[in-house]
Amino acid sequence: MNRIMLLAKIHRATVTEADLHYEGSCGIDEDLLDAANMREFEKIELYNINNGNRFSTYIIKAVRGSGIISLNGAAARKAHVGDHLIICTYGSVPDAEVNNHVPKIVLVGDNNSIKEIKKI
């Protein structure tokens, strides 16, 4: 049997852009993607710290070093520029590996810069 487990989390990312008329997705600075081991087109769950909205979409790459977190399409209705988000990926982990599974956590500071990377 497998369990769905947290793989990675970007914590307290600040929304920098929201474009309702874009096709969809969430643009994330490539530095953050690399730090969290997240991939373009991967499904993500997002939790808006400001208003409690929870929603899912997929990742597209934003310019490396830009600090961009952009919500596009329908996701743009779930948060405003300046809102703080928790961005998570989950995956299937075999029961035999669950006790050794360690998610990667990226804590974000000002301008969506990487403040700390840790494993919990």
Swiss-Prot record:
Post-translational modifications: Is synthesized initially as an inactive proenzyme, which is activated by self-cleavage at a specific serine bond to produce a beta-subunit with a hydroxyl group at its C-terminus and an alpha-subunit with a pyruvoyl group at its N-terminus.
What Gene3D superfamilies does the record tag this protein with? 2.40.40.20
Q: Which SUPFAM superfamilies match?
A: ADC-like
Tell me its cofactors. Answer: pyruvate
Known catalytic reactions: L-aspartate + H(+) = beta-alanine + CO2
> GO cellular-component terms in the record?
cytosol
Could you name the domain of life of the organism this protein comes from?
A: Bacteria
Question: In which pathway does this enzyme or protein participate?
Answer: Cofactor biosynthesis; (R)-pantothenate biosynthesis; beta-alanine from L-aspartate: step 1/1
Q: Which GO terms describe its molecular function?
A: aspartate 1-decarboxylase activity
- What InterPro entries does the annotation carry? Asp_de-COase-like_dom_sf, Asp_decarbox
The Swiss-Prot or TrEMBL record describes its family as follows: Belongs to the PanD family.
State how it assembles.
Heterooctamer of four alpha and four beta subunits.
Database matches in PANTHER family: ASPARTATE 1-DECARBOXYLASE
**Function, please?**
Catalyzes the pyruvoyl-dependent decarboxylation of aspartate to produce beta-alanine.
What's the protein called, per UniProt? Aspartate 1-decarboxylase
Q: Origin organism of this chain? A: Polynucleobacter asymbioticus (strain DSM 18221 / CIP 109841 / QLW-P1DMWA-1) (Polynucleobacter necessarius subsp. asymbioticus)
